[in-house]
Structure formats: structure tokens, C-alpha cells
Amino acid sequence: MDAKGFKLRPKTLDSKECRRIYLNLIENFVGWAETKFVETDAYEKGGGHFRASGSGVTWARGNSNLCIAYAVLLTAYPERKEFTIHKIPRAQLENHLRRTIRFLCLSYRGKRKPSWRPGWQVSLEFLGAAWAAHLFEKHLDKDTVDLVRKTTCAVADSLKKRIPSRRFGDTGSEDCTWNAPFLAFAANKYADDSRAKKWDELCKKWAFNALSTGNDKKSDSVADGRPLKEWIVSENVHPDLTIENHGMWSVGYQVACQAFAHGELAYRLFGRKPPEAFAHHADDMWRNVTRALYLWDGDILFPTGQDWSWKSYAQSEYLCWQRLSRRQAAAGAFESRAIQMALKRQLAVGTGALGYSNFGNNTTKPNKWAFSYLCHKHIDSPDPVSMEEAYKESLGVYIFPHVKVAVHRAPTKIVSVSWHDKYQPIYILPEGDSTFANPPFFFPYARTSGGVRITSESTGKKQRRAERWSKIQLLEAERTHEGKGTRVRYTRSRKDGITQYVSIASLPDEATVYCTAFQASKDGAYRVESPFHFKAATIQGFPMRTEQHRGKRWLNISDHVGFVSTAVLPAKLPSDRFAAADDRTYQAKAGEWFGALAVVVYTRQPHARTRKMADRVRLLAEDAKKVISLRLESSSGGSTVQFKLPK
């Protein structure tokens, strides 16, 4: 695989180009998958399946994921005799696909190992195989076709169960987004079955409840022939349409409704109009939530910290769905970036994987690529818009009180601040083509990004680790500069009596100001280490070029981002890191603020400009009891920012 030979293109790709990239991604992955196939006579002589279990993925789901990928690849190239750089014969791929489909059917409620049965992932454990059998049906024998029908119908029947209702911490939304598409396929593929109408109705019910709010339960609005309140039996999302999972705002689950593309596709391919249920809150969510999260390289921001794999671009399927089904042309610009970055990374890894995660977890990606390919094949794309236009549409301040996050999208940056009970990362991300076609580095979504380590030395015993912050109090989260900037202030406290004050002021231009101070409930010595620390990183396929320029109070990394501190910086910092001040021990009295510090972060700024700005950033006044005033300069001119300390 040649990563150097693949060049990233800034333009928005058309559907034909997207299909080609999706097929390349799938074919590369299939080369890896072929090393995981195992022979077994567990259910019939000459059977087989893939070793495809992994993090969050059951063995059956992993095999189903591979089935749809194989079927799409084989049907897209009906005349090809060999596949992948390994020149795998077509007959081998067809054989493994057929045997895997049969193994999944025979092992449903099986008495041998491995087996699978109705459970919370049951839809995912067979939807890919069911679709694969449909696409590849003319190459399958009657017995296999009959087995697939029997298993599909049995799984569809198992979905007549209680719809989950979980708004806080562990949403029930994802279950709904998985189950509705399966029922859509069963109802349309087997429309001659006496149960098809019931599956169709149940599909709509699961779909409506995927993005259900409290107000939906009272709504008389008519959708799919009934008042909405008659469909809704749950409350799975917050009033602002944000979604929690894993105890935080895990945005992979925010876009889990990307699976609705599979459901809509089932209706379209069998000549029926998709139900309105798949559109429930979809446009409002894009406009008010999810478009705030997609970055210039097509990746999605994790405001409360990374969940699952970093920079896998797995959420590109949501962009495909928004682009084609919801007609959001801007999503196409982000999709174009995401799938190119995924292919570049895959080529660099060289195995077909996207790195970091295990094989079973990785199988979720070719599943998404396969369905995205099918959508681009069967649904016309809206007229494309450029990335510049798409990004401009998303500019502004987004405040999400239920998940405790504020996001500011400005022309050269995205600033994200979290005051979540567990995680309070601060991200200041440079945006623009330099973060796509020629990125010098990325800032990982570490949950401690922009944080600090502080320990008490009062006991005479050195603490090995700082205690976790246990109480967060939001003081302010508001729009400034006529909606073009934002300010967030909060305090966070610990059980040992230490409180940190944090204030972030994101200006409409390239400048963002961070201010902090500390308070202790007891007299004593307190050690503050690495305040406002950031670390740069990169992914496979993108060599990290970090060139550090610095002075006493300023530092610039690769003419990409500049920092100016009110304190003297550490004498030695690795070229990929920043901290706003040297480690220092303070003698503090109970109730008094200490360690006050401010930093101005400039995005997309040459180092000569950062050096010049350093002379113009200064504290005007510091009253440890009341207020800190900071004077700075940016491309918009001079500004004075005041930080009021809590009483």
C-alpha cells in the first residue's frame, strides 16, 4: 500500500469519486480480513467464519459487518478475478462470503459455540449479512437464501420488545437507531410475509424514539399518519437534542442515527418512500448540534474527551446520510475530507486497518463504508459546496447546557470548553487547509487537555497524584461580541479543599484568552505543575513536523499556533508541547487566591507575529481578591479582558 502516492484534494468530491474511495477502503480491509477466516465443522461440514469479535463488537456483529463489505466489493466489480494487493482470487472471497452467511444463520440460537441469540446487538449481528445476501442473491443456492429469510424474520420478530427510555448518562437512542433499519429491511425485502406490515409499523416506532424528547410525548403534530405523541414511548435525548453515553457527551452516539441511511435505503431500493420517522429531529440536530462538531479534516470533535479510537473518521457515514438523504450539501464537503483522511491513514498503516483498535472493533468501519457506497450509488447528491462555504455556514457559538459544553467556531479556530462533572478539557484547534492537506500536527482529544496538576505539600508527604475534581460550578457561559465570541467561567473543587477558577474568552478572531487562579481552604504550601498544558500529536500517514520558536513568555509551534503567557515559560519544553508556566510551589493562606495566570492563544499565526504580540500582552492590574485585567492585541486590534474572581 502506497500512502505517498495518494494525494489529498481540498475540493468536494462528487458521488462517483466518493464511491471509488469507499471501494478502495473496503478492498484494503478485505485483504486484512482474509487472514482472520477460520474453517470449522461446528454447524455443518465445510463451514467457516471470521475471528471478528473485539472491543464493543460481538463475533456475530463482526462477521455481519464483513459480509456487507464483501458483497459490496464483489458486486461493484463483477468482472474482477483478483482483489487486493495480495491478488486474492474472486472465488475465495465468494466462498468465504457464502460460508459466513450460512454460519451466521445456522448459529442463531445455536447449541454449539460460537452462537448468538436475541440481545441488545441482535440487529447489528445480522443486518450486514441480510443485506449481503440480498446483493449477492443470484450467486447463492436456494438453501442459503431460505436460511437467510428464516433468520431475518426471526430477528425481526425478536424486536417486538420494550423500547428503552434513557436520557441521562447512557442513552437508549442507539438501540433505536440499530433496530429500526433492520425492521425496514425485513418489511421491504419480505413484503410478502404476513408479518411485514407489523414490522413496518414497528420500524417507524423505533425510529421515532431514537431522537425522542420530553416534548414529543405531548406533541399533536402528525407524522406517518398519527399524532407524534402516539409514537413516542421514551425520552432518549435532551431538549437541545444532545445525547449522552458512557457517562458523558460521547459524540459517536450523538450521530448514531447515521444508521438510518440503511433503513431509508431499504425503502428506496424496493420502490417505496422512506417514512417520516427517519427524519424526526434530523434537520434540527444538524443545524443546532452536529455541524458544530465537524472539523476541517472531516473528523468529529469530542468535547468531553476521546471515546473509542482517535482520528478513525468513522462518523463519515453520518455526513453521507446528511448529504444524500437530508440534502445538507455542506455535509458533503466534510465527508469528502473524512474519507480521504481515512484512506490516507489506512494506506500508511499498510495492513488494511485504521490503527490502534483490534480487528473486531475495526470491522465497524467497512460496514459504514459499504452502506455509504450504496447510498452514493442509489441516491443523487445535491449540488456540491466548497469547504469554505460549508465551514462558513457553521460559524458561531453553540452552548449546550445539558452536556455542559460550549463550542465556538471562528474562521481560523474551534474552541471547545467543557464543565462536565468528570471531564473538563479545553481545546483550541487551528482550522483551515493546513489542517487537512498538509497538517503539521493535531491536538489529541485528551481529557486533561488545557488542564493543570496541583498537589498539597502541607502534610509533609509528597502526593503521587493530584486528586480528581469533584465539584464543578458554572459561573457563566454566554455569547459575546454580538454572537461572534464566547466567554465561559467556572470553578472546580476537590475534596482536599483546593479550588481552581477557570475563565476562557474566545474572541471573534484568532485570539483566545485563558485565565486561572487557585484557592485553598487551609494555610499551606501548594505545588502547581504544567498549567494549561497541551500536547501535539499526529496519526499514521502524517509525519509530525513540529518546529518550535520561543521567547521568555511566548512559544509558537510550526507557525500553526502561538502562545503568550503572563508568566515565564518552562526553560525546556519538547517541540510538541506547551505549558503556561514553570512548576512552582506557593505559600498560600486559607481563602486567598494564588497562582493567577493568563495565556493568549493565537491560531494559524506565524512565529514572527507571535513574537510581536508577546510585547503587547500584559497584566494591567491584579487584585488577588477581585479582578485580573489583561491587555492584548490581535488582528482585530487591541482588547482588554477582565476576569472577575469569585467571592
What do the PLM-derived regions correspond to, one by one?
Residues 1, 646-647:
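Bacterial/eukaryotic Sec-type N-terminal signal peptides
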Residues 1-80, 84-109:
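Low-complexity, Ser/Thr/Pro/Gly-enriched N-terminal "stalk/linker" regions
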Residues 36-61, 101-126, 135, 139-141, ...:
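Extended, helix-rich scaffolding/adaptor regions
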Residues 74, 78, 137, 191, ...:
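Short coil/turn linking the two alpha-helices of tandem helical-hairpin repeats
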Residues 112-132, 146-403:
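Extracellular polysaccharide-recognition and catalytic grooves
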Residues 270-277, 295-628, 637-642:
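Extended polysaccharide-engagement surfaces of secreted carbohydrate-active enzymes
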Residues 630-632, 646:
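Acidic, serine/threonine- and proline-rich intrinsically disordered appendage/tail regions
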